[in-house]
């Protein structure tokens, strides 16, 4: 979906532009947003986005794309590709140039727009991609639970639980659901690469002289985030902390110690503790419990660093606000207690756990912030 903007449509010499026309157009856009998302999903899975990126700015026709991707029924496939890319061009996903072909008919060619960098299925730049996250959110399993949102609101409970009779993480761990679990892990890993790269670019709290020598990553999975952080900041010693069955799968990382346990029982000691996308999984009571354990594990003047989406205090018609509120409703749909929060709400949680109410925020990327709280 795009931000509400004024569109001017013209067909057959006529034009529509009054407020009521535009309001209705916007209503249709909102209601038809799944068409854009699912078309983009297919374009990513077919390899169209990667192929346009590989063209390095050169314009490519739908016929050429169909041939390069060896799509069967080339003529029909090329016509379908052209219609898909024409839609995506209207949303600025790709660029489109139209000229008369040898037969006098309109002939379109396409090139990657800047957004395609973040939609690559096979990103090898090291920056990561948002495509795996999008493919996860648009997967059948994760789309199904949206059909239960109304019931979850009217009857109580969580839409995912109503759809599948179990919680999200229990579902992912069940026999037979390995494809969904793999898709989920790929999405989280790719998204983490994007944000951790930006965290290292903009956040100075890990620098030598910042007072951090031992960094504990709570809920750090198999240690991918600490691998990136300690590679950039070799003066740091890392402690990767997660549930024992997760740590059992963690590969050795130079300068990083893997420890298994529960953040609800105990957190290992360090001069700083990192919580990246942990608190948004939990309700307020659970968050305070986690933060209290972090407080106990820190020395005087030690810091807890929260890396989270931060909601604006009131809704705004901006891409950043829309993404944050969109994610918040995803959490409402999938996880009991899970939610996004404002900076003040994070501050209130930290204060309830004993931390200073002085929050030091650093903007990272795509409305993700690093929020530092001191003991």
Curated annotation (Swiss-Prot):
S-adenosyl-L-methionine binds at residues 219, 242, 263, 276. Its EC number is 2.1.1.232. The keyword Methyltransferase applies. It catalyses: (2S)-naringenin + S-adenosyl-L-methionine = (2S)-sakuranetin + S-adenosyl-L-homocysteine + H(+). The active site is at residue 280. One of its GO terms (molecular function) is naringenin 7-O-methyltransferase activity. PANTHER family: O-METHYLTRANSFERASE. S-adenosyl-L-methionine-dependent methyltransferase involved in the biosynthesis of the sakuranetin, an inducible defense mechanism of O.sativa against pathogen attack. This is Naringenin 7-O-methyltransferase. Substrate binds at residues 136-142. It comes from Oryza sativa subsp. japonica (Rice). The keyword S-adenosyl-L-methionine applies. Keywords: Methyltransferase, S-adenosyl-L-methionine, Transferase. It is an enzyme of class 2 (transferase). Induction: By jasmonic acid (JA). Up-regulated in leaves infected by the pathogen M.oryzae. SUPFAM superfamilies: S-adenosyl-L-methionine-dependent methyltransferases, Winged helix' DNA-binding domain. InterPro entries: COMT-like (IPR016461), O_MeTrfase_dom (IPR001077), Plant_O-MeTrfase_dimerisation (IPR012967), SAM-dependent_MTases_sf (IPR029063), WH-like_DNA-bd_sf (IPR036388), WH_DNA-bd_sf (IPR036390). Belongs to the class I-like SAM-binding methyltransferase superfamily. Cation-independent O-methyltransferase family. COMT subfamily. Pfam families: Dimerisation (PF08100), Methyltransf_2 (PF00891). Residues 168-188 are annotated as: Substrate binding. GO terms for biological process: biosynthetic process; methylation. The lineage of its organism: Eukaryota, Viridiplantae, Streptophyta, Embryophyta, Tracheophyta.
